[in-house]
């Protein structure tokens, strides 16, 4: 059974949902576009929780009703009640666990768009080839989700691979899903260039950063040095006759970003500034996390790039996410963007972890009050 504290929190959310529903029908709110969107967004953010709570109540009512029938004089009715209970009772605990997960505090960055950096690591040309495949995997996943992808910068490698690539992904709550991709992705397979048929291990590093708005990060123009140059193709040759590519250097931190995908220097500068703000935002987020808890290890999804998070074993047609001990097969589908189940496994695991931490915090607060 859910504890009284958990039920109280869920009922408060339901009450807020009802208040927001009434506000949406208020002419004063309906006539104010900004207010209406804000109210509608908040209501949508808790609607799933309320729906689950009401379904849970109905489930408990159904269980109680059938338990009452177990004492009925009619043996046929008692048998039907037993059959119903055999189906209903196993649903109670999973429903309760799901409701608890809805109470996990939301990451304030979850609704943000993201910047994804993909870099070939150890493994030479094979790492570059896999980096290109990982990039395509995210593009295909974004297409499945109805998100928009823009290539901001790329550095070509041999055999059609990439040394590094930077993408922006925009859409509905992009960071809430892609944040679990930060880290080292390891591939085990026989490279196309391997004549002896030996299995090689290569790595690709992925960094996912929430896109920062100007309100999130203030950048002093005097701290930014801008260089312009001609865009280059994958082989290094110039592909533009004007200096449209832009390189920005943030002098206080030494961060360097560049963008050369657009023909317009202004557009490249705008996109480069977007990348710079995201990197500075990430630094500030990391500083705050470290200040809150230097020993906390729930870094996944918030950017620990040195962590080996996943292995793609092609000879065994197997993907393993080492953080959550999740395994699945059919790598061709994975590389074509079919990764929602992996992301869901990560989300469930870390939400449960956050809930345990929050519960320990609540227990500690209760002890202090006592």
Curated annotation (Swiss-Prot):
Q: Which InterPro entries match?
A: PCRF, Pep_chain_release_fac_I, Pep_chain_release_fac_I_sf, Prokaryotic/Mito_RF, RF-1
Which residues are annotated as modified residue N5-methylglutamine in the UniProt record? Answer: 237
Residue stretches of biased makeup (Basic and acidic residues): 286-296
GO CC entries = cytoplasm
One function term, GO molecular function aspect: translation release factor activity, codon specific
**UniProt subcellular location:** Cytoplasm
Extract the ranges annotated as region (Disordered). 286-310
Q: Mainly resides where? A: cytoplasm
Q: Return the Pfam families for the record.
A: PCRF (PF03462), RF-1 (PF00472)
Instruction: Briefly state the modifications made to the protein after translation.
Output: Methylated by PrmC. Methylation increases the termination efficiency of RF1.
Does ATP-binding appear among the keywords? no
Q: Which UniProt keywords apply?
A: Cytoplasm, Methylation, Protein biosynthesis
Matching PANTHER family, A to Z? LD18447P
HAMAP family registered for this protein in UniProt: Rel_fac_1 (MF_00093)
Query: Which family is annotated?
Result: Belongs to the prokaryotic/mitochondrial release factor family.
State what this protein does.
Peptide chain release factor 1 directs the termination of translation in response to the peptide chain termination codons UAG and UAA.
**Name under which the protein is recorded:** Peptide chain release factor 1
């Amino acid at each position: 059974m859910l504890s009284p504290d958990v039920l109280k929190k869920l009922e408060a959310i339901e009450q807020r949902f009802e208040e927001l529903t009434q506000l949406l029908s208020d002419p004063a709110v309906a006539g104010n576009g900004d207010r209406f969107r804000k109210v509608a967004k908040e209501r949508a953010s808790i609607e799933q929780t309320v729906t689950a709570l009401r379904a849970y109540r109905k489930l408990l009512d159904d269980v109680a009703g059938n338990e009452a029938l177990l004492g009925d004089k009619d043996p046929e009715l008692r048998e039907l009640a037993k059959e119903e209970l055999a189906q209903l009772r196993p649903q109670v605990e999973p429903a309760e666990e799901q409701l608890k997960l809805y109470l996990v505090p939301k990451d304030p960055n979850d609704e943000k768009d993201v910047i994804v950096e993909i870099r070939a690591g150890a493994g030479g040309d094979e790492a570059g080839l896999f980096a290109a495949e990982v990039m395509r995997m995210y593009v295909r996943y974004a297409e499945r989700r109805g998100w928009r992808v823009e290539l901001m910068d790329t550095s070509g490698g041999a055999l059609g691979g990439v040394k590094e690539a930077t993408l922006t992904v925009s859409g509905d709550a992009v960071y809430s899903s892609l944040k679990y991709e930060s880290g080292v992705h390891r591939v085990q397979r026989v490279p196309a260039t391997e004549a002896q048929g030996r299995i090689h291990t290569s790595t690709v590093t992925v960094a996912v950063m929430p896109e920062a708005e100007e309100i999130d990060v203030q950048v002093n123009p005097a701290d930014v040095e801008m260089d312009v140059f001609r865009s280059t193709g994958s082989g290094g040759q110039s592909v533009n006759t004007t200096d449209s590519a832009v390189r920005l250097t943030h002098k206080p931190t030494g961060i360097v970003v560049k963008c050369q995908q657009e023909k317009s220097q202004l557009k490249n500068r705008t996109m480069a500034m977007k990348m710079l703000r995201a990197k500075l935002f990430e630094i500030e987020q990391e500083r705050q996390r470290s200040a809150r808890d230097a020993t906390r290890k729930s870094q996944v999804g918030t950017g620990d790039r040195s962590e080996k998070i996943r292995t793609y074993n092609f000879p065994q047609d197997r993907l393993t996410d080492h953080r959550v001990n999740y395994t699945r097969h059919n790598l061709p589908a994975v590389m074509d963007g079919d990764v929602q189940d992996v992301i869901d496994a990560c989300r469930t695991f870390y939400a449960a972890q956050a809930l345990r931490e929050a519960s320990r915090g609540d227990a500690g607060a209760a002890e202090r009050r006592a």
